[in-house]
Amino acid sequence: MKRIFLLIATNFAILLVASIVMSILGVNTSTMGGLLVFAAIFGFGGSFISLAISKWMAKKTMGCEVITQPRDSMERWLVETVARQAEKSGIKMPEVAIYQSPEMNAFATGPSKNNALVAVSSGLLYGMTQDEIEGVLAHEVSHVANGDMVTLTLIQGVVNTFVIFAARVVAGIINNFVSSNDEEGEGLGMFAYMAVVFVLDMLFGILASMIVAYFSRIREFKADEGAARLAGKNKMIAALERLRQGPESGAMPAQMSAFGINGKRSIAELMMSHPPLEKRIAALKNS
């Protein structure tokens, strides 16, 4: 969830900047080719900037302490386990870090398979057995090995481009409609036009977030499958069962709930980056 939050936050900022820059430059929505190029530059630009700084940002915002020299047997075991799983997955050893949080959480981030970070919370280390922790680590290493950070960045870039492009096309149509029905033919005016674009950016942005969340849920199932291969199905199921017994998702800040969020039903599930734990456990048992 952490990587999704950082992507979405950065991309909403990019949408706002795009709106301002386009208005200043007077980009004409009737010039579809130019608008599409402009939208793609901003759409993918925001996503790749977010990806490039993801590891640095995670360390700063989460207060991650990277293990360079293990201080005790637990840290040594963490590093050795991640190293073994990374070698088995055919990727370079990710950095391993611990951050202070009472919640049982973990996340993986980084710009590429061979430049990644796997971090676990102190709450996870003290709240799970070693087998369960191994399952969690395998899940995060699988995210890295599957290239999920890059995959979601590309998806986010596509939907960002759609949001920027579609919002301005629709705003242009509204402006032309108002202009045709206005005796003076002035249309919306600059500030009203910017307000319409901003509202459309937000509406299309919500739809885009649902699309990204949908693909993220698919990647979670894939990471669970990968974890089952790396650590064993029973260890992964045990980790998910432990998370299910923990606090409800409402007790966790959304941007920190990087692993195993208990999903809500109906429309709320469409915005979840992770499937409900029950579905993940059932998928593993049936695999």
UniProtKB/Swiss-Prot annotation:
<keyword id="KW-0997">Cell inner membrane</keyword>
<keyword id="KW-1133">Transmembrane helix</keyword>
<dbReference type="Pfam" id="PF01435">
    <property type="entry name" value="Peptidase_M48"/>
</dbReference>
<keyword id="KW-0378">Hydrolase</keyword>
<keyword id="KW-0862">Zinc</keyword>
<dbReference type="GO" id="GO:0004222">
    <property type="term" value="F:metalloendopeptidase activity"/>
</dbReference>
<keyword id="KW-0479">Metal-binding</keyword>
<keyword id="KW-1003">Cell membrane</keyword>
<feature type="transmembrane region" description="Helical">
    <location>
        <begin position="195"/>
        <end position="215"/>
    </location>
</feature>
<dbReference type="GO" id="GO:0006508">
    <property type="term" value="P:proteolysis"/>
</dbReference>
<feature type="binding site">
    <location>
        <position position="220"/>
    </location>
    <ligand>
        <name>Zn(2+)</name>
    </ligand>
</feature>
<protein>
    <recommendedName>
        <fullName>Protease HtpX</fullName>
        <ecNumber>3.4.24.-</ecNumber>
    </recommendedName>
</protein>
<keyword id="KW-0812">Transmembrane</keyword>
<feature type="transmembrane region" description="Helical">
    <location>
        <begin position="4"/>
        <end position="24"/>
    </location>
</feature>
<feature type="transmembrane region" description="Helical">
    <location>
        <begin position="154"/>
        <end position="174"/>
    </location>
</feature>
<dbReference type="GO" id="GO:0008270">
    <property type="term" value="F:zinc ion binding"/>
</dbReference>
<dbReference type="InterPro" id="IPR001915">
    <property type="entry name" value="Peptidase_M48"/>
</dbReference>
<comment type="similarity">
    <text>Belongs to the peptidase M48B family.</text>
</comment>
<dbReference type="InterPro" id="IPR050083">
    <property type="entry name" value="HtpX_protease"/>
</dbReference>
<feature type="binding site">
    <location>
        <position position="139"/>
    </location>
    <ligand>
        <name>Zn(2+)</name>
    </ligand>
</feature>
<keyword id="KW-0472">Membrane</keyword>
<dbReference type="GO" id="GO:0005886">
    <property type="term" value="C:plasma membrane"/>
</dbReference>
<feature type="active site">
    <location>
        <position position="140"/>
    </location>
</feature>
<feature type="transmembrane region" description="Helical">
    <location>
        <begin position="33"/>
        <end position="53"/>
    </location>
</feature>
<keyword id="KW-0482">Metalloprotease</keyword>
<keyword id="KW-0645">Protease</keyword>
<feature type="binding site">
    <location>
        <position position="143"/>
    </location>
    <ligand>
        <name>Zn(2+)</name>
    </ligand>
</feature>
<dbReference type="InterPro" id="IPR022919">
    <property type="entry name" value="Pept_M48_protease_HtpX"/>
</dbReference>
